[in-house]
From Swiss-Prot:
PROSITE patterns associated with the record: NDPK, NDPK_LIKE
Species in which this protein is naturally found: Haemophilus influenzae (strain PittEE)
Family that this chain belongs to: Belongs to the NDK family.
Cysteine disulfide partners in this protein: none
Name of the protein this chain belongs to: Nucleoside diphosphate kinase
Length: 140
């Protein structure tokens, strides 16, 4: 079944000019990019996006990191998009990520791990709606 998932190219990757390399990986792995834009998160946006982590020790540093540079948010589409995207990006910790995954190849650390990906269809839908209106998403 064709699904949509949500992606963020995070500040560490944007600062190192890896946007093109990462978007190319998406397309090489069968994903259609049906929406994409560069944004600079406000504190309110970053805190809202990561609200489920509020009160945790890593919340404040995560918010600061996500505000440190523009990010690229995208909506990707393909069969089994959520699962396949999670496989493509690899585990959160790049040291344990499989060879050939985006995080193994590009991430600097567990926090500066280059990309975010939705972990369920429900979260993908919520995250897509957080950043995109329906008129910004295009069928291809």
């Amino acid at each position: 079944m064709t699904e949509r998932t949500f992606s963020i190219i995070k500040p560490d990757a944007v600062k190192r000019n890896l946007i093109g390399a990462i978007l190319t990986r998406f397309e090489q792995n069968g994903f259609k990019i049906i929406a994409s834009k560069m944004v600079r998160l406000t504190r309110e946006q970053a805190e809202g996006f990561y609200a489920e982590h509020q009160g945790k020790e890593f919340f404040a540093p995560l918010v600061e990191y996500m505000m440190s540079s523009p990010i690229v948010v995208s909506v990707l589409e393909k069969e089994n998009a959520v699962k396949d995207y999670r496989t493509l990006i690899g585990t959160t910790n790049p040291e344990t990520a499989e060879e050939g995954t985006i995080r193994k190849d590009f991430a600097l650390s567990q926090r500066e791990n280059s990309v975010h990906g939705s972990d369920s269809i429900e979260n993908a839908n919520r995250e897509i709606a957080y950043f995109f209106t329906d008129c910004e998403i295009f069928e291809r």
